[in-house]
């Protein structure tokens, strides 16, 4: 049967939400700059929804929009706008005003933010990924800032420390027997059964199959402790190893 030239279908995309809590353009700019300096590659061209529910009157939306774009964010829509005049300004700037129910289900506290990528995989796809996992890739030396290690179709084991600015990526599980201060991304090929294990957690970012937490989203009582990170009911979950 021949397919139609175009199709409109429902999907399950979710986005990072940028909550603006001040009208002060300079303060917004400085705060974005500081955040980007912490994770320069992570925020490059990342799509975001801008939530303006906490903004008061006299908002210079044009300038705020310019600043967000200048820092490399891609605005896909604006949520939390209740003022009709403000809505008109946003629409005239070329952006859609989104209903709250259409945005990511997040707590206003960024620490509670769950980034849920599309996780609908067929059983056959999952079996193929499991079959592709090969011999474990083992690193015995320290992983320095700026280094990136990718264990393709494999688990990754690091028996040493991982510095801030370093990145570990594996299609399977990742084990770090040491202190980890860089970025750790398991299940890079979409395997939702992958896990992260580490003995001393100070990571800048942890991710399993596309779902991630930044350092300030990791529950504080796990910082500096041994932990395992995995997906449970499609959400990132962390437990103690001790």
From Swiss-Prot:
A GO biological process held by the record: division septum assembly
Sorted UniProt keywords: Cell cycle, Cell division, Septation
Disulfide linkage: none
UniProt cross-references to InterPro entries, sorted A to Z: CAP/MinC_C, MinC, MinC_C_sf, MinC_N, Septum_form_inhib_MinC_C
SUPFAM superfamilies: Cell-division inhibitor MinC, C-terminal domain
Quaternary assembly: Interacts with MinD and FtsZ.
Task of the protein: Cell division inhibitor that blocks the formation of polar Z ring septums. Rapidly oscillates between the poles of the cell to destabilize FtsZ filaments that have formed before they mature into polar Z rings. Prevents FtsZ polymerization.
HAMAP family: MinC (MF_00267)
Protein's UniProt name: Probable septum site-determining protein MinC
Organism in which the protein naturally occurs: Buchnera aphidicola subsp. Schizaphis graminum (strain Sg)
Taxonomic lineage: Bacteria, Pseudomonadati, Pseudomonadota, Gammaproteobacteria, Enterobacterales
